[in-house]
């Protein structure tokens, strides 16, 4: 599959699942404004993947027109535990490089599993993507969006309730239809 095809599938997942289920009430606006950047990282080497993550932070530094960036790993981190290692290293790198409070890291994986949850819990599908990916968001933009959103702390609970109400079969079908 080409990078373009991977990006197209990722965009469809964002449109159909993230926006369609309203998991992120702010996503529709940045997609509509076309201020999302997508980067496919083909390597499977951890160091190269971290270098790519650092490059994405610098890309956001250099391009104010980009609100958010998805770094997609179609060939790496097939095991969720390996992916969690990447997330931990990326979060540490974000802090070490002075980006804490500047960028926020969100994580998505095909086998995403919330702590203390069962693998068949439909709530996991709020973060189950079609590829392992890291999502960088500008903290300033998040803060601005939250100013106009009533009860932002309720978003995760609303998402979990939605997924559980729809059920495992529906959430799995929605994601796997891509």
What do the predicted segments below correspond to?
Residues 1-178:
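Expand to "…catalyze enediolate/carbanion chemistry for C-C bond making/breaking, isomerization
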């Amino acid at each position: 599959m080409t990078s373009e095809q991977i990006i197209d599938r990722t965009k469809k997942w964002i449109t159909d699942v993230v926006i369609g289920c309203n998991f992120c009430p702010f996503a529709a606006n940045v997609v509509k404004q076309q201020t999302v950047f997508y980067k496919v990282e083909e390597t499977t080497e951890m160091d190269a993947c971290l270098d790519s993550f650092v490059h994405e932070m610098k890309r956001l530094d250099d391009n104010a027109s980009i609100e958010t960036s998805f770094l997609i790993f179609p060939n790496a981190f097939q095991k969720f535990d390996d992916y969690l290692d990447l997330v931990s290293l990326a979060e540490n790198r974000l802090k070490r490089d002075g980006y804490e409070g500047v960028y926020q890291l969100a994580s998505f994986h095909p086998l995403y599993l919330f702590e203390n949850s069962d693998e068949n819990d439909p709530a996991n599908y709020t973060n189950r993507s079609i590829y392992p990916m890291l999502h960088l968001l500008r903290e300033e933009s998040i803060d601005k969006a939250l100013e106009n959103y009533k009860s932002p702390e309720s978003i995760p609970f609303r998402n979990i309730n939605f997924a559980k109400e729809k059920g495992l079969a529906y959430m799995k079908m929605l994601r796997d239809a891509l």
